[in-house]
Amino acid sequence: MNILSRIFARTPSLRTRVVVATAIGAAIPVLIVGTVVWVGITNDRKERLDRRLDEAAGFAIPFVPRGLDEIPRSPNDQDALITVRRGNVIKSNSDITLPKLQDDYADTYVRGVRYRVRTVEIPGPEPTSVAVGATYDATVAETNNLHRRVLLICTFAIGAAAVFAWLLAAFAVRPFKQLAEQTRSIDAGDEAPRVEVHGASEAIEIAEAMRGMLQRIWNEQNRTKEALASARDFAAVSSHELRTPLTAMRTNLEVLSTLDLPDDQRKEVLNDVIRTQSRIEATLSALERLAQGELSTSDDHVPVDITDLLDRAAHDAARIYPDLDVSLVPSPTCIIVGLPAGLRLAVDNAIANAVKHGGATLVQLSAVSSRAGVEIAIDDNGSGVPEGERQVVFERFSRGSTASHSGSGLGLALVAQQAQLHGGTASLENSPLGGARLVLRLPGPS
């Protein structure tokens, strides 16, 4: 019972459905044609029997006026029964007398045998009628034989259609089987899995949809891996970079809690704790921005007006650093597709580095647009960066020899990250103002 329930509960395969649909589709016209042929055969056999009776009657009628002593049989139909009635006299060519029936053709039973009877009225002084009959046995046997042939032909036609459908369905479902095999062979760790199917357009559409789905899954998997790597990196770097300042803070706090220091020394220790706390806060904030940058996607990119972005950055820098002279070189509007917050972060960090580590008092912002893209430059009159250190300072927690030790060492790393996220580069050069020039080269839309 369980096996049967499983069989009937199981969803039929596509191949089976194609075969069933083809068999039903073939059965309908075959049954219609078979029914027409069946009825046609039945009527034709009956018409043949009627023609036999007509022929036998036509042969017998000329002999009736000669007398009823002998009624000859038709030479073409020796089995035909002939019964002649003239008045009250009834004469038959056999021991079976056909009953009197209405004119034309009629069916009757004599001694339990079914007969087809043709009755013809002959005009004359005395009413005379000739009844010619024949059994249905031969006609029924012949009709049944032809009916069996029709059934066999119809059954063969439907069966042949089902067999051909089964064979052709094998080719039709082959792309789907290939798709299933390729899907089963895909492991969770596969990179950019490929699903290639050729054949039916429906299978190709499903394969394309699966490729898109797998690509999205793969992209999300990569993002998850990147997020996990970023989290591990964040934890490792945070542990390494924060251990020293936290140890210094703990030492200072222990000194404050255990020693009775003079006011000036106590104030100096407290200031050191505050500076260390600010450094830790800056480091954590920079690490957070780095992690956010690594998790950004192309969906976050929007049109950005670089000229307007630099103008706002210059105004904000003038407010944050009152002693700094910040200017923007006039230029036409430059619009690219990018991350507004990320580009603003890169420009702000470049200005902050120029002030904090280069001691700059003059910063000049500019943007130049070309077919290749946009080039953003931040020039300052600070101490600059030695040529041998211009690549190293873009690494995380890397500080130049001229940099102060109060920063997190992540400012230029954030700039390099944003350049990479936009498909561009970040580099340091000599500035016409005497200090350093930080250049962001961002490609235009492809």
Swiss-Prot record:
Domain Histidine kinase per the UniProt entry, residue ranges: 237-446
The family database entries (CDD domains) matched by this protein are listed as: HAMP, HATPase, HisKA
Superkingdom of source: Bacteria
Give the main location.
membrane
Look at the named UniProt entry and state the broad enzyme category this protein falls under: transferase
As stated in the Swiss-Prot or TrEMBL entry, residues carrying the post-translational modification Phosphohistidine are H240
Q: Where in the cell is it found?
A: Cell membrane
Q: Which reaction does it catalyse?
A: ATP + protein L-histidine = ADP + protein N-phospho-L-histidine
Could you tell me the keywords of this UniProt record?
A: ATP-binding, Cell membrane, Kinase, Membrane, Nucleotide-binding, Phosphoprotein, Transferase, Transmembrane, Transmembrane helix, Two-component regulatory system
What switches on its expression? By nitrogen-limiting conditions.
Membrane topology value = Multi-pass membrane protein
Quote the Gene3D superfamilies the UniProt record gives. Answer: 1.10.287.130, 6.10.340.10, Histidine kinase-like ATPase, C-terminal domain (3.30.565.10)
Membrane spanning residue stretches: 19-39, 151-171
Q: Its GO biological process terms? A: phosphorelay signal transduction system
Q: Which InterPro entries match?
A: HAMP_dom, HATPase_C_sf, His_kinase_dom, HisK_dim/P_dom, HisK_dim/P_sf, Sig_transdc_His_kin-like_C, TCS_sensor_his_kinase
Which is one Pfam family of this protein?
HisKA
Biological role: Member of the two-component regulatory system PrrB/PrrA that is involved specifically in early intracellular multiplication of Mycobacterium and is essential for its viability. Functions as a sensor protein kinase which is autophosphorylated at a histidine residue and transfers its phosphate group to the conserved aspartic acid residue in the regulatory domain of PrrA. In turn, PrrA binds to the upstream promoter regions of target genes including itself to positively regulate their expression.
The name under which this protein is listed is Sensor-type histidine kinase PrrB
Q: What species does this protein belong to? A: Mycobacterium tuberculosis (strain ATCC 25618 / H37Rv)
Q: Which gene encodes it?
A: prrB
